[in-house]
Amino acid sequence: MLGREDIRTYQVYLANEKKLAPGSIHIALSALRFFFNVTLERDWAPEEVLPLPKKPQKLPIILSPDEVQHFLGCVADVKHHAILTTCYAAGLRISEAVQLKPTDIDSQRMVVRVEHGKGQKDRYVMLSPKLLEILRDYWRMWRPEAWLFPGDRAGHPITRYAVGQACVKPHDLSRLSKPVTPHSLRHAFVVHLLEAGADVRTIQPLLGHRSLATTAHYLRIATNKVCATESPFELLPRPAPTPPPSKPQYF
């Protein structure tokens, strides 16, 4: 059986020789855990021998409302404009947006039905009146039937890859320094709601998050929440004014 030093040597090899990120090292050690626990049926976990490296928690780069509007204004293709606007306006994952059907758009109740979201759970999200107008204009032009956003293959929805590629040209035209992807539009949806005063518990079901902590993570990014909190430095008494320097004796 592998010992502590064997695992340590392997981990150092992955980090220093292979130059793997902490997430990739997690995967490698998880494979070892599976091999021992499942294949060999031995109760052993790498983290009991050696602590797993911590994954760096990077905050996503958030587009401002003006940047979102500018980017979407650069999307010339009607279908691409409609689906990317849907990702932002409804806060959908790209995997959810491509699976939408025309019948999922409920203009009577002003909601969008999301079937089999992450975790295979259905949910409803808000339908913006402005989004409804864009979708209606798109529908009049395309007349989609089975899928709201059909792909190049008959009977299949547009692929996630195609939607990702649809961001490339508009991003170049927009000259935005920040990266833009379908998922960054979802990030922007969350942060803009928080900055507008929406409650985390209200946003959680819209995103389809199981845990409130996942949604609360975005509070670290909502800048108005940070800026609205006064620094304790402002509470310190101001120092007495410094007296002006004395006038030189001869001039």
From Swiss-Prot:
Transmembrane segments: none annotated. The active site is at residues 93, 118, 183, 186, 209, 218. It comes from the Bacteria. Residues 1-40 form the Core-binding (CB) domain. GO terms for molecular function: DNA binding. Residues 58-231 form the Tyr recombinase domain. InterPro entries: CB, DNA_brk_join_enz, Integrase-like_cat_sf, Integrase_catalytic, Integrase_recombinase_N, Integrase_SAM-like_N, Tyrosine_recombinase_XerCD. One of its GO terms (biological process) is DNA recombination. Pfam families: Phage_int_SAM_4, Phage_integrase. SUPFAM superfamilies: DNA breaking-rejoining enzymes. Gene3D superfamilies: 1.10.150.130, Intergrase catalytic core. Keywords: DNA integration, DNA recombination, DNA-binding, Plasmid, Transposable element, Viral genome integration, Virus entry into host cell. Belongs to the 'phage' integrase family. This is Putative integrase/recombinase y4eF. It comes from Sinorhizobium fredii (strain NBRC 101917 / NGR234). The lineage of its organism: Bacteria, Pseudomonadati, Pseudomonadota, Alphaproteobacteria, Hyphomicrobiales.
